[in-house]
Swiss-Prot record:
Belongs to the SIS family. DiaA subfamily. Pfam families: SIS_2. CDD domains: SIS_GmhA. Gene3D superfamilies: Glucose-6-phosphate isomerase like protein, domain 1 (3.40.50.10490). Keywords: DNA replication. PANTHER family: DNAA INITIATOR-ASSOCIATING PROTEIN DIAA, SEDOHEPTULOSE 7-PHOSPHATE ISOMERASE / DNAA INITIATOR-ASSOCIATING FACTOR FOR REPLICATION INITIATION. Residues 34-196 form the SIS domain. This is DnaA initiator-associating protein DiaA. Disulfide bonds: none annotated. InterPro entries: DiaA, GmhA/DiaA, SIS_dom, SIS_dom_sf, SIS_GmhA/DiaA_subfam. Homotetramer; dimer of dimers.
Amino acid sequence: MLERIKVCFTESIQTQIAAAEALPDAISRAAMTLVQSLLNGNKILCCGNGTSGANAQHFAASMINRYETERPGLPAIALNTDNVVLTAITNDRLHDEVYAKQVRALGHAGDVLLAISTRGNSRDIVKAVEAAVTRDMTIVALTGYDGGELAGLLGPQDVEIRIPSHRSARIHEMHMLTVNCLCDLIDNTLFPHQDD
């Protein structure tokens, strides 16, 4: 058991090192995309399933409340949090449309969809991205593995942050770290603080 624990930590560290080498440009582009949307008076819609949904909620909560320092709230909506809306849509047997319907109702040109999917193949996330494209929204996608179907939907203005791993647990860990990086970059760009 102790050896298995060491393996988990070692894999996580190795994935972080690989991501630190591969992802800074994509994370920087994503942060600037989010910042520009907010500066233009737009909002960020976020979606994901399971642990990816928790990461989407964490991002939205960090925008609306704060990340590490006090600042005004920023407009972000996690589409996986309203149980009444979610169950109304799925009750009509529209499981794949659970986020797309919300994107079509709430999204506008200039808004950003933060789509989080470990493999990039979740039908409801793919449909949300397709809906965002029809609304002239920009997409920031957090993926893993080979990016899946989601990666193929992205245009030149969109940003994919693909975790260099084929282990779901490691991808989820790195998605959380990436969300924290994005929150930090957004805060420090919009509300730079002086170190005394």
